[in-house]
Amino acid sequence: ETQVIYPKDIGLIIMLADIFPGAKVVEAGFGSGALTLGLLRSTGNSGSVTSYELRKNQATKALNNISPFMKDMHNLTIKYGDIYEQLDETNVDRLVLDVPEPWNVVPHATRMLLPGGIFLSFLPTVLQVHKLVNELTQTCFQLIETAETLLRPWHVTQKSMRPTHRMVAHTGFITTARLCSPRPR
């Protein structure tokens, strides 16, 4: 089974990746479909989302999760395959990854993203982030940043205010990088 990406992370992913109406987005790790739904809504009717998934049964579950919220999915393409080996898209605005080894996608990303395109990866551990950032720095990616979202709700009444007893803290790290053109020699 897959882990659902929380709304707090989906919102930050959409903002940090600058997902805009009309964007051409490639996603890997279709998962539950929660992030895909956010990407589809953000790209709008004029954009497109291509999602890679290894398992057809998982993609079917994700589509079943998405369909009650979005009947028209004309701008969603699902490709079955290993993103580490197969990435044939070009002129992509944004690449959004929820896979365990995103550093293996970096060489493909440099060929598929447009100059100025954004690479984003969602990872659970800091060791994975470290390995990814080391790989990104060896290429034409710049403005490499990593963040996490901690959501702390508050209990507010007429007579008191305090944080609630439960907090959705660490769920993952979000790393972004922007593809730059190589310097002329």
Regions found by a protein language model. Name each.
Residues 6, 31-32:
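Conserved SAM/SAH-binding loop
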Residues 20-31:
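Conserved class I S-adenosyl-L-methionine
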Residues 22, 41-48, 115:
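Conserved S-adenosyl-L-methionine
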Residues 32-45, 110-111:
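Conserved SAM-binding loop of SAM-dependent methyltransferases across substrates and taxa
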Residues 40, 103-117, 135-137:
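A short glycine-rich, Lys/Arg-flanked "PGG" loop and its adjoining helix->strand segment in the class I
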Residues 52-103:
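S-adenosyl-L-methionine
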Residues 116-124, 128:
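Conserved beta-strand signature within the Rossmann-like core of class I S-adenosyl-L-methionine
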Residues 134-185:
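SAM/dcSAM-binding transferase cores
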